[in-house]
């Protein structure tokens, strides 16, 4: 009997140390009713299974998976905030875009530890129903576990972890995958420890009623009424020692796992503390500095002003280059017009010279035609006499036909001829006198004679011109007087003789006017020559009549030639004049085009000036606008400065909150260290329990030799059991305190994370 009792005590100590395994039954057999008033096989407050047919059931610790919502990470999105301007009633509202982080969730799985009633190992048949042989089955007629009275839980009672839900921070649906994993592990560890200790919080669980199984304990206790009669005679079933050792090994492994979890918690706490330290030591944001904001605004204004000036200078340079190009084009056109006018003047000068040459050639031709009658003065005199005869005849005819008008015409002819001859001969004779006065000697006399001959020739040409003019006037007069006038006869010849007499007198006076140095021989020769000239003149007078007809023919030919020349000259002149008119028209048109282009350029310049004025006004308006914006920016900067000050106050508050969080984390770290010390102390207590088991084993060997009556009087064993219960109560209090610290840590972490997201 003593040996069996020692084995059961070791089993109870191992089970109280927190042994659990998936699907592993925790066996216990009831003791005899006469053993002691301190029965270890008592039921809970309300049994989960009614006593009766379920005597072969055992409590199993099972694990099941449940779905839950986990936070996978965070994603960012842009949120627009509209804020009213605070420095004025009419200022526009500002829009600020913020990047906000929101959590992203996923469906995860969580393992939950629970108790299930199943058939004990090795039991089958009528006492083990089929629906309880399945490992996933749960016993029927399960009822919820009632709340244990606070008076029976010892000094530090705590409710079951499954009936209390951890508080969650506001505004947050999850704590991230890392926090979820930590929470899951801590919850599992805390649930396991609480499940193991919950049944030992009240000593009445051990010494209470023995009619129902103890449900909250991590193992099943079958009451006395459920033991079969055949098993009661054979005594309680004793589990093998290897199973007990395996349970102890599992307990030690579980404790090592809890130590590792505590180490992880400590590492997480230290990591959070380091992160908070980095947040405290992080430099402030550059946007909170007013000097940096002012420098940024100044740089933006300088860049804007530089860009405006550069654009204005580029526009001015473009306008100036365009104006220069247009001025160069106008200058080029003016130079081309000047060159064209110069070419026109040169062509006109060339035409004028050509016309002058042609006129001089025409004069020489006319002079040649007048001299075709003879090469000497005699021939010229013959022609003159012939023309004079014809004139006399014409005048005679006029006098005969008209009578009175004839005398007038004769008087007119005499007057004209006398005046013409007088003027022309006087001039020529004066020229001859001057020439003769410059010569000396015989050579001089000869030269004077030659010059006199030249003078006579010139006199003949002059006389011919005078006669031609006289003929023209006579023809005009004859046409006016009578269109049917006849040719005059020789009645007008005395006039010619008188003129010749006058000429002879002038020659005589010329002879007498010679210098005294001349010799008489020369004078005699000259007199003889004059006489010869007189005789020749008489012969010429006779020849005049013969050459009258020839002279008339010659006059007709000359008239025809003159008409042809006049027509040719007129046509050429008309063509040249037409060409000149065309050139002048083209020049006038080009000048008109130049004036139009100049007017266009002037209009363009005026438009450019107006556009520049408008541009200047616009630039001034923009500058005023920029100044107003700068002033408004200054007011906004003041408002921003106030906001910065407010933000600084909020940051100070946040720093104070972070300091509080740091203090909380330090408390959490201290709690973790205390928990570690508690776990170490718990290991020591487990070692003490193992030693106690050994001592109890030795005690059991000694008790086997003692009778049963003496064993009843030994109260020391139950004293040890009371100590064990007291130790379990202390452990429950420590675990409750650790749970409170864990909840505080969770709340502080939940407060820190929203601040980081903001």
Curated annotation (Swiss-Prot):
Stretch list, region Disordered: 131-178
EMI domain segment(s): 54-130
Disulfide bonds: 58-120, 85-91, 119-128
InterPro entries: Collagen/C1q_domain, EMI_domain
Domain of life: Eukaryota
Signal peptide: 1-21
GO cellular component entries: cytoplasm; extracellular region
Protein name: EMILIN-3
Organism name: Mus musculus (Mouse)
């Amino acid at each position: 009997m003593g040996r069996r009792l020692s084995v059961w005590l070791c089993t109870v100590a191992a089970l109280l140390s927190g042994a659990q395994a998936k699907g592993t039954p925790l066996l216990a057999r009831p003791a005899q009713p006469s053993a002691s008033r301190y029965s270890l096989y008592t039921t809970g407050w309300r049994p989960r299974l009614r006593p009766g047919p379920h005597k072969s059931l055992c409590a199993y610790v099972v694990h099941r998976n449940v779905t839950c919502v986990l936070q996978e990470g965070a994603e960012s999105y842009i949120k627009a905030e509209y804020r009213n301007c605070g420095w004025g009633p009419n200022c526009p509202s500002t829009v600020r875009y913020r990047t906000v982080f929101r959590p992203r969730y996923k469906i995860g799985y969580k393992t939950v530890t629970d108790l299930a009633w199943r058939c004990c190992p090795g039991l089958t048949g009528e006492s083990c129903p089929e629906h309880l042989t399945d490992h996933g089955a749960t016993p029927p007629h399960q009822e919820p576990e009632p709340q244990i009275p606070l008076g029976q839980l010892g000094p530090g009672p705590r409710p079951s972890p499954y009936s209390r839900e951890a508080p969650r921070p506001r505004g947050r649906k999850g704590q991230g995958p890392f926090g979820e994993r930590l929470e899951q592990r801590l919850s599992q560890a805390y649930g396991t420890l609480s499940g193991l200790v919950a049944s030992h919080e009240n000593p009445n669980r051990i010494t209470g009623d023995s009619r129902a199984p103890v449900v909250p304990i991590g193992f099943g206790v079958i009451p006395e009424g459920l033991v079969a009669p055949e098993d009661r005679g054979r005594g309680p079933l004793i589990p093998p020692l290897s199973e007990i050792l395996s349970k102890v090994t599992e307990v030690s492994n579980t404790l090592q796992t809890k130590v590792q979890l505590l180490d992880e918690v400590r590492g997480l706490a230290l990591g959070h503390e380091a992160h908070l330290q980095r947040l405290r030591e992080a430099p402030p944001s550059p946007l909170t500095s007013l000097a940096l904001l002012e420098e940024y605004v100044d740089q933006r204004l300088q860049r804007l002003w530089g860009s405006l000036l550069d654009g204005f200078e580029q526009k001015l340079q473009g306008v100036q280059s365009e104006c220069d190009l247009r001025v160069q084009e106008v200058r080029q056109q003016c130079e081309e017009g000047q060159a064209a006018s110069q070419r026109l003047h040169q062509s006109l000068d060339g035409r004028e010279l050509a016309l002058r040459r042609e006129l001089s050639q025409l004069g020489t031709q006319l002079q040649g035609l007048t001299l075709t009658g003879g090469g000497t003065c005699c021939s010229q005199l013959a022609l003159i006499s012939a023309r004079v005869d014809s004139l006399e005849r014409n005048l005679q005819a006029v006098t005969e036909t008209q009578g009175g008008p004839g005398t007038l015409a004769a008087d007119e002819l005499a007057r004209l001829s006398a005046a013409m001859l007088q003027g022309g001969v006087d001039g020529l004779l004066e020229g001859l006198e001057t020439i003769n006065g410059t010569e000396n000697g015989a050579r001089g006399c000869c030269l004077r004679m030659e010059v006199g001959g030249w003078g006579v020739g010139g006199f003949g040409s002059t006389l011919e011109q005078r006669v031609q003019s006289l003929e023209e006037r006579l023809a005009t007069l004859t046409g006016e007087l009578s269109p049917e006038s006849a040719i005059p006869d020789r009645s007008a010849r005395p006039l010619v003789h008188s003129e010749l007499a006058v000429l002879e007198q002038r020659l005589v006076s010329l002879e007498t006017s010679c210098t005294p140095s001349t010799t008489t021989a020369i004078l005699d020769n000259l007199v003889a020559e004059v006489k010869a000239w007189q005789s020749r003149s008489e012969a010429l007078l006779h020849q005049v009549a013969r050459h009258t007809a020839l002279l008339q023919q010659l006059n007709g030919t000359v008239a025809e030639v003159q008409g042809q020349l006049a027509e040719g000259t007129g046509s050429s002149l008309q063509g040249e004049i037409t060409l000149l008119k065309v050139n002048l028209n083209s020049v006038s048109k080009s000048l008109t085009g130049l004036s139009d282009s100049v007017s266009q350029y002037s209009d363009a310049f005026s438009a450019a000036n107006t556009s520049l004025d408008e541009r200047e006004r616009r630039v001034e308006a923009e500058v005023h606008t920029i100044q107003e914006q700068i002033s408004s920016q200054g007011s906004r900067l003041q408002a921003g400065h106030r906001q910065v000050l407010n933000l600084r106050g909020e940051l100070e508050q946040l720093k104070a909150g972070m300091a509080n969080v740091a203090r909380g984390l330090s408390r959490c770290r201290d709690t973790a260290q205390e928990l570690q010390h508690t776990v170490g102390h718990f290991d020591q207590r487990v070692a003490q329990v193992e030693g106690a088991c050994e001592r109890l084993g030795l005690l059991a060997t000694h008790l086997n030799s003692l009778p049963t009556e003496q064993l009843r009087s030994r109260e020391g064993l139950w004293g040890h059991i009371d100590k064990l219960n007291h130790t379990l109560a202390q452990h429950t209090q420590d675990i409750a305190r650790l749970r409170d610290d864990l909840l505080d840590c969770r709340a502080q972490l939940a407060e820190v994370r929203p601040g980081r997201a903001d």
